[in-house]
């Protein structure tokens, strides 16, 4: 069974220690130090120095917050170096101390939720717990990194309908538990990225959210229990436009590690201007289909 929950503070140190001893992870980090965009990294021996600095920082991390503090520094650098202008709209409408369920469009595997958190942090809001697919934890070290960063897994696979339902129930209960505890949650509006640029919410995602509430309320009352806020992000330049086009045209088969390479390419390459908009909180009674539209 796939673990759904992210890591807790008490697990952080041991997980990071295992990562530092994971040769596959360390090799990937070293091979992805971008010499083409850094004059320092073009100096002989500089990559080794960066790796030692990386390891020393990791040793001082003892909690999820401390890990996210380091992620925040990296993300700030990504925004400064790969985004020409980052605009937000609707942040002023978010109330403090109110747990929101953000349902977002999905263009980039990790940046959509990361930039949502970047925006929330800028106004003093807590970061979200982020929903990810089980495909992203198929490589152990990537699963570790994502779980350290408050990601939880929604598994839609299973040997039987009962197993699939059980997995979705666990995810729904996790989301309910976090929202009830005063935490924000981010989830994509549908499974997989919008490779064709069409953003459309899948009613199945909304039905999954209601599973944990089925004994409490009808679906039409879900907006009385969850503070649902749609959010939408747009990238002027998509670093993975070619790859998405190839997948749409079935001209390129998907490799096992393709998601990982797409994550790093999406993070490291130029994105031009980026805009993130938060809509008003949804009120009223809806069916899954009407809420999706």
What does each of the following model-derived ranges do?
Residues 288-293:
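Long, compositionally biased intrinsically disordered regions
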Residues 1-100, 106-117, 121, 143, ...:
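Membrane-anchoring hydrophobic helices of lipid-metabolizing enzymes
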Residues 283-287:
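Hydrophobic alpha-helix feature that most strongly marks membrane-spanning transmembrane helices
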Residues 74, 78-282:
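Soluble catalytic domains of membrane acyltransferases
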């Amino acid at each position: 069974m796939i673990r759904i929950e992210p890591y807790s503070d008490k697990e952080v140190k041991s997980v990071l220690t295992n990562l530092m001893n994971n040769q596959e992870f360390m090799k990937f980090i070293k091979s992805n130090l971008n010499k083409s965009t850094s004059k320092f990294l073009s100096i002989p021996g500089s990559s080794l120095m960066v790796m030692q600095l990386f390891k020393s920082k990791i040793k001082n991390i003892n909690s999820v917050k401390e890990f996210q503090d380091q992620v925040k520094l990296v993300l700030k650098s990504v925004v400064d170096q790969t985004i020409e202008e980052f605009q937000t709209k609707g942040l002023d409408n978010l109330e403090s101390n109110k747990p929101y369920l953000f349902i977002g469009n999905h263009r980039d595997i990790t940046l959509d939720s990361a930039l949502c958190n970047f925006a929330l942090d800028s106004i003093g809001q807590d970061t979200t717990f982020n929903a990810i697919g089980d495909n992203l934890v198929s490589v152990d070290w990537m699963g570790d990194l994502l779980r350290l960063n408050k990601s939880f897994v929604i598994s839609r696979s299973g040997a039987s309908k009962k197993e699939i339902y059980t997995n979705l129930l666990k995810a729904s209960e996790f989301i309910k538990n976090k929202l009830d505890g005063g935490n924000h949650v981010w989830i994509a509006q549908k499974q997989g990225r919008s490779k064709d640029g069409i953003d459309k919410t899948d009613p199945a995602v909304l039905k999954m959210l209601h599973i944990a509430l089925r004994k409490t309320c009808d679906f039409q009352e879900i907006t009385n229990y969850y503070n649902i806020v749609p959010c939408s992000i747009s990238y002027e330049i998509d670093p993975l436009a070619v790859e998405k086009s190839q997948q749409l045209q079935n001209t390129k088969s998907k490799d096992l590690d393709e998601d990982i390479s797409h994550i790093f390419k999406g993070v490291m390459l130029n994105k031009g201007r980026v805009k993130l908009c938060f809509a008003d909180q949804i009120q009223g009674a809806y069916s899954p289909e009407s809420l999706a539209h």
